[in-house]
Amino acid sequence: MKIYIASSEKHVGKIQEDVYMRDAYRNKGFSCEIVILKNIIKISKPFDVVILKSIWGYHLHYREFLKQVLMLRKKNIKLINDYDFIFWNIDKYKYLYELKHMNVTPTTLLSLKNTKKASEIKNIILQINKTLNTNTLVIKPCISESGYLTFKYDKTKDNKAIIALLQQNKQLDFIAQPYRPDIVTGELSVVIINGIPLYGIKRFPGIFSEKLDPTYIRFISLPGAIKKEIDILKIFLLKKFGVFPNICRVDFLKLNVGYEILEVELIDPDLFFRYIPDVMREKATSMIYKSFVI
């Protein structure tokens, strides 16, 4: 068995988290390499392991990405996370809709394919403003990451530039969510390995606020409201898939006195290894390792 850490051409061998995982598994006696995904398809053999990591940018060519994933499955490659999790997690609107029984940021589908004029796009968005009872929306593609085509749309301001970009990309499906002012205080993320919540991360992605370094938070120190949502999510995942994902990150946003789930990351979640204690990094890596040697 060989372990491949899947990366992209731009990032292969350059991401600290990838390098740490590679070295950790080499130290356990495994053959482990960081390789771009399209090359892994060519060289991997049945029962090898592929961990999706710095494949950032897959959303730009997601159909090709899904074809590559299917080719891995056809070759009987062990994928982290497993195939069904990847297919479920790729479309934000679809998976968030399935989680609507939880405290998820209200999410509406924004389809612009049939529009011809900027005024039509504006009217559709204004209707969503009304439906969600908010002046300000966050708009982003259903399949996206890292702030790609993500806009803050305030109906009281001039939005010509945003509407123009939406019009240029109207072939994409978008989601619209109410903008939460508390985003400026950062997001709280929880990293879960094999169904066990390990630690939290206070993060400032820099999309609608200043970009700052993330900070580590012990899981025991996280708010009870977040722990409750994690428990409900675990029940859902176990019921739907029969197993927990090997690697999961759940991003929360503060709302008044509680918290909302903003996203659930299962495809290539950043685990923020560079910001957590060595002992926790070693624990997380070992737990991931156990998921593919059993």
Enumerate the language-model features and the residues they cover.
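Nucleotide donor/acceptor-binding cores
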Residues: 1-2, 48
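Flexible loop residues that form catalytic
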Residues: 8, 55, 112, 142, ...
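ATP-dependent carboxylate activation and anion-phosphoryl transfer catalytic cores
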Residues: 225-294
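Active-site nucleotide/adenylate-binding loops and adjacent lid/helix of ATP-dependent enzymes
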Residues: 4-7, 73-75, 84-185, 227-231
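Short, solvent-exposed loop/turn segments at secondary-structure boundaries
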Residues: 16, 151-153, 275-277
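Conserved N-proximal alpha/beta basic substrate-recognition cap immediately N-terminal to
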Residues: 9-112, 116
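Phosphate-binding site of ATP-dependent enzymes
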Residues: 148-236, 253, 260
